[in-house]
Amino acid sequence: MKKLFIVLTFILLSRYIFAQIVAGPMLGYVEHREAAIWVEVDAKVGKIGIEYWPKTNLQNKIIIQFKGELKNRYNPITFELPELQMNTAYQYQFVIDGKAISPSKIYEFKTKDLWEWRKPAPDFKFLFGSCVYINDSIYDRPGKPYGQNPIILEKMADTEADFNIWGGDNLYLREADYSSASGIAYRYSHDRAALELQRVLAARPNYAIWDDHDYGPNDSNHSYGLKNVTYNCFKNYFPQRNYGYNSTEGIYQSFKYSDASFFMMDDRFYRSANELPDMLDGKPNADKTYYGNQQLNWLKNALISSNAVFKFIVNGSQILNPVADKECLRSYDTEFKELMKFIQTNKINGVVFITGDRHFTEMHKISTPGFYDMYDFTSSPITSGVYAVDKTKENINPTRVEGSLFIGNSYSRIGISGPKKERKITFEIFDQQGQLKWEYSINQAQLTVPK
């Protein structure tokens, strides 16, 4: 009887402690010697720490206590784990109010390897997608729920990959959300707590940008009055090494993985209204901005100085689609031409755009004489409603890669593989059930300026 009592007490205590975790854990960035781990705890929690150790050395445990304020309505927390060993698997667990969570709640990550000047660039794969709508009937529009079957998030967790990139509209602020700071905080916390999200967020590192719906109202621009609130919320829920540049606000950033660089763009914070005229007095409207001068200059400097074989520009809306609606960089003629001219004039190899937003998936290829073909791969939506683009004028699109159009809930996996100077990118589209629907490869030579 005493043994049974002890077992029951342990089970109840473990359940109580784990119930104090509202959402998470989520892996943020993971570098060679540092990693970020995110979690959100209940308002009742008075103290939380993280205990971590090399997987092969259980005796070498380190505990970091959270020093910030707790017991707020919402308590998103980021632990930064410093001075890690390279190319090493670590395990971790949380300690809440002095008690460790059940051993079944031990999580794992692995730091990056130092491969440069030592070995070939590692092959890798990452998941990419956009538009995650979590139903919340109190605040949703009447009628059929807009959010689709969240089982796709479980399928993403089961799909082999090294990290995730969330391509914007990672949640949807409703009218009752984006009208107040408390509404915004509620939406970020509510959607992050979705049960189906937890495994995919804990499985591997996560990187993210936003688009209009996690920034503010539909098609929102730099005039949105609470953009600093959503900016801070985004940073609190997606921990990265840095955001913006030189004290400039915005969620743009970059990171490198193996021999690829990722330039994560902010297409909202400095964006002019779509409705502003594209032309003034017969000339492009130079005041109609998309990225803004500082962000665009940051991108130029980052691109021209990058030694990566592949340079992925990640954006919330499409870049190259010539028949897209107003939500495309191509509709912002001045900045679009400036960026394309810069890439071509400076003969920057390996540039590929990966984008979200459209509620269908496709790839565009644009040919320019004397330069390599440029690609824009769009992956959308994960759980949001699907857009029947095949019933619109966009159904016939001369730049769409044949077979790439997929209309349905989906996510994508992008892989980089191959020997030195013969690297290739492989794009894969998976449906709601995790079934492969389309595959396409581009080799390094195809993304190299002709000599």
For the regions a protein language model found, what residue spans apply to each?
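Metal-dependent phosphoester/phosphodiester hydrolase catalytic core
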Residues: 20-451
